[in-house]
Amino acid sequence: MGDFILPNLRDKPLSVLHVGRGFVVVDKLPHFLSVPGRGHDMDDCVVARVKEVFPLAKGPISVHRLDVETSGLMVLALRRDAHRTLSMQFEKREVDKLYIALLEGRVEADGGRIELAFSLDWPNRPKRVYDPQNGKLGITEWEVIERTEKATRVRFKPITGRTHQLRVHAAHEKGIGHPIIGDSLYGNPDLAERLMLHSTQLSFNHPETSQRLHFDMPAPF
């Protein structure tokens, strides 16, 4: 694709993989915010680092986000028109995303489709809880790639993009019933130093030419 490679940003929380007309694709490391959090000590994030490299970027920049614990591919807009176009693609579910995860234990099923509604657990936020009455429906397709007695590697294809969707769908008994390894909210955080969830593939239409673009970043685990 002729990717334009830039040096890693300071402290290496993310790498710029591709610069296109009006957008940039990055690889985010775990334990790093996608957008600013609340408080001055949470200003450092993907958006802030991209603005450092592209000081002439205009508009909101953020098109979508990954959980702070999740690593992998993100696309950000560098112009307002690109932001509108890319945001619309996410809204219309025209963006294809694939994730790799390691789940606790041995998953016997080979794959499936999960349709599970959940909502914010206010007393324990940011945790989400199963809520078939008032929750928002999340839809995820998944398949097993490899399994052992202690862990199962799966590929997730989220159809919707709810916060914590893959984590809830993995952990809940009405989903897969096996939390993602290292999940501090829905599983045993002592099993790994990070959440074993990675955005490995991202496909969308170029905001100017409508050419379909595909990006891959293998999971580091």
Which sequence ranges carry the predicted segments?
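RNA pseudouridine synthases
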Residues: 1-221
